[in-house]
A protein has these predicted regions:
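Anion-binding alpha/beta catalytic cores of soluble intermediary-metabolism enzymes, centered on
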Residues: 1-78, 84, 88-220
Length: 220
């Protein structure tokens, strides 16, 4: 399915980590970090957390690109010129996004427990801590697609074939997560359809009541 609007989201019982860039050489990461791309990823993650994971008001932590999140410009300008503006715009759209945080201290202090998801700038920044914590039970989920796609968080591990050493846990969790997301999407679709219409109420009038039943009668 050829869709540019997706997020590689690693999911476990302890954390969810999304990536701005995925399989790129480290030397090319910076040129792919833009305000528009970060904002797009935040929108997708926020929507996915609501419809796929049943989190009503998700909180998303955003990492910086440089060590110490740029250290106020001493170690890079991407945080101030690109990442922070994307976070500000996301907040204007109602997305609870906070940061940018330095990745090392964020995981070291267990701040990840305070957030529903994390947006990392590049592959190893997000996946090394994720796999250290959840290698055998993590799931690779593609957020933003119209269908559910999951896979084990680890690679194929062909060297373990026929050795009776491979763990099925991540594969099993991928199946369970796919079922849970399918169920959550059905529930989200049900509660989101036929929303109440918006009414303009003039607060200067004495009678501010709205005849909801009359509006409903017009719809049938």
């Amino acid at each position: 399915f050829n869709s540019p609007n997706f997020v590689m989201l690693m999911v476990s019982e302890t954390m969810k980590v999304g990536l701005v860039t995925t399989h790129l050489p480290l030397s090319k990461v910076a040129e792919h970090i833009t305000k528009e791309v970060i904002l797009s990823k935040l929108r997708i993650i926020s929507q996915s957390l609501q419809q796929d994971f049943a989190i009503t008001r998700p909180r998303i932590a955003v990492f910086g690109l440089n060590p110490h999140a740029g250290d106020n410009g001493l170690l890079g300008k991407e945080e101030a010129e690109i990442i922070q503006p994307a976070i500000i715009q996301a907040k204007k759209e109602g997305i609870i996004a906070l940061g940018p945080y330095p990745a090392d201290g964020f995981f070291g202090s267990e701040n990840y427990r305070k957030f529903d998801a994390i947006l990392a700038m590049y592959h190893d920044q997000g996946l090394i801590p994720f796999k250290l914590a959840s290698f055998e039970r993590g799931v690779n989920y593609t957020a933003g697609l119209p269908f559910v796609r999951t896979s084990p968080a680890h690679g194929t591990a062909y060297e373990l074939a026929g050795e009776d050493k491979a763990s099925p846990d991540s594969f099993r969790q991928a199946l369970y997560l796919a079922l849970d997301i399918h169920k959550n999407r059905k529930i989200y679709e049900e509660i989101s359809k036929n929303p109440l219409k918006k009414f303009d109420i003039n607060s200067n009038q004495e009678d501010e009541s709205v005849d909801i039943e009359a509006e409903d009668d017009n719809n049938y």
